[in-house]
Amino acid sequence: MKKPIIQLLLIFTIVSIVPFLLNTSYISLYTFVGVLWSITIVGISFVIFIENRSPQSTLAWFLVLALLPVVGVLLYSIFGRSRWRRKKHLHRSEEQRKLFREILEGRRLELSLKVPLSERSVHLTEVVQKFGGGPAADRTTTKLLTNGDQTFSEILQAIEQAKHHIHIQYYIYKSDEIGTKVRDALIKKAKDGVIVRFLYDGLGSNTLRRRFLQPMKEAGIEIVEFDPIFSAWLLETVNYRNHRKIVIVDGEIGFTGGLNVGDEYLGRSKKFPVWRDSHLKVEGKALYKLQAIFLEDWLYASSGLNTYSWDPFMNRQYFPGKEISNAEGAVQIVASGPSSDDKSIRNTLLAVMGSAKKSIWIATPYFIPDQETLTLLRLSAISGIDVRILYPGKSDSIISDQASQSYFTPLLKAGASIYSYKDGFMHAKILLVDDKIATIGTANMDVRSFELNYEIISVLYESETVHDIKRDFEDDFKHSTEIKWNAFQKRSIKKRILESFMRLISPLL
């Protein structure tokens, strides 16, 4: 049933003009169109039903089609169809992909753990790898970067030190002060002979203009847009965005986390004078996986413009194998996206939270969990585990904010603690379990990150960075207001109805 909605809409358009062409009078146009729309909606409902979506998603789409039949059809044609596969990825040379994997597999011994970890951590690394994550890497150092000032300072310093290549990928990249500063640093290195590849998402970075990018092209920087929104494939790609943020310098230094590139991430916007976020600097063996993820995205996005293959990257210049001999703990990089049925990141988060014995602390700007995640958190809280959720007191999305609050009641009743960050916008995406294991990355605790976006997280095992994450959590709790059950249950009926409605349509967000 290829492209069913486009076909149905095409049939509708063609048949709708038949009465005009034939000048028939035995049936009114109003009746004719009404019947045809009914058939179209029934057809779409059938498609939704046989796609075996989650009950919440299925119900949400049925509701939209029932209440907004015309608009609902258009919305579903753009946002609702089942997970789109990267068809161009599948057409790529399987021999090249196999060779690329073999190179990484051949270095598995180099990636094998030599640092002693607890039995639980070792078991988790094995489970996460089965979910699709890369092998856990020791001899890797990580550094927690708190907020924009520290993050951009470290990134610019790393760019300045580049000798061979710089790979940079962002969901949102803005042509403001910090965006221009990073761009100019890239141009300078490109003129010095460093290879620079710049990948940005077509929707998230839709404000980038030719006049901003042209100096980069003139300096020799390779620029690729991930799934442009103005293309023949708009309906195929608009709902599946690349939300990853990656910077790699010489295959030795990497950055990933919650921060995009823009002045607002430095707290320079009137709406959010404080932007609370977290990023991660990585050096060592874990760069193997981070580099591989960037290159896969790069080759996919550039396949329509160039004749790239894996071959130019099969060398030590891109995978130098830098080791940090005195590094503690281990790092595991996990990526997921709509090109695969595996919910690697979601399953990884469930596995990490499921291993908790004492505490589960979560920071997320959007809390719209699926049923499995919500159930795990409820049961953990009931069993006495210290479950805490830190979310923004002031959100950048009213819809997401109301939907998030609809999930608070079952958690508060189970004994979980909810904290509303009051100093600004909480944009960090972090999980901390038992002060021993943590995750940090681009994925929010919501269905979009679990199923629709291309995301990336880093799982940190028993390293000093985990303690730094705990320190930041404790500081954030001091700048937050705890939501008490007695006060929360006194919300007005109007607000509860709004929350419930937003929760009902949350699978569509």
Swiss-Prot record:
InterPro entries (alphabetical): Cardiolipin_synth_Firmi, Cardiolipin_synthase, CLS_N, PLD-like_dom, PLipase_D/transphosphatidylase
Superkingdom as given in the UniProt entry: Bacteria
Membrane topology annotation: Multi-pass membrane protein
Single GO biological process annotation from the record: cardiolipin biosynthetic process
GO-annotated molecular function: cardiolipin synthase activity
EC number of this enzyme: 2.7.8.-
Annotated localization: Cell membrane
Active site positions, chain numbering: H243, K245, D250, H427, K429, D434
Keywords: Cell membrane, Lipid biosynthesis, Lipid metabolism, Membrane, Phospholipid biosynthesis, Phospholipid metabolism, Repeat, Transferase, Transmembrane, Transmembrane helix
Domain PLD phosphodiesterase: 238-265, 422-449
Keyword Oxidoreductase: no
GO annotation, cellular component aspect: plasma membrane
EC top class named in words: transferase
Segments crossing the lipid bilayer: 4-24, 30-50, 59-79
SUPFAM superfamilies xrefs: Phospholipase D/nuclease
Annotated catalysed reactions: 2 a 1,2-diacyl-sn-glycero-3-phospho-(1'-sn-glycerol) = a cardiolipin + glycerol
Function as written in the Swiss-Prot or TrEMBL entry: Catalyzes the reversible phosphatidyl group transfer from one phosphatidylglycerol molecule to another to form cardiolipin (CL) (diphosphatidylglycerol) and glycerol.
NCBIfam families given in the database record: bac_cardiolipin, PRK12452.1
Entry similarity comment: Belongs to the phospholipase D family. Cardiolipin synthase subfamily.
PANTHER family: CARDIOLIPIN SYNTHASE (PTHR21248), CARDIOLIPIN SYNTHASE YWIE-RELATED (PTHR21248:SF20)
UniProt-recorded name of the protein: Cardiolipin synthase 1
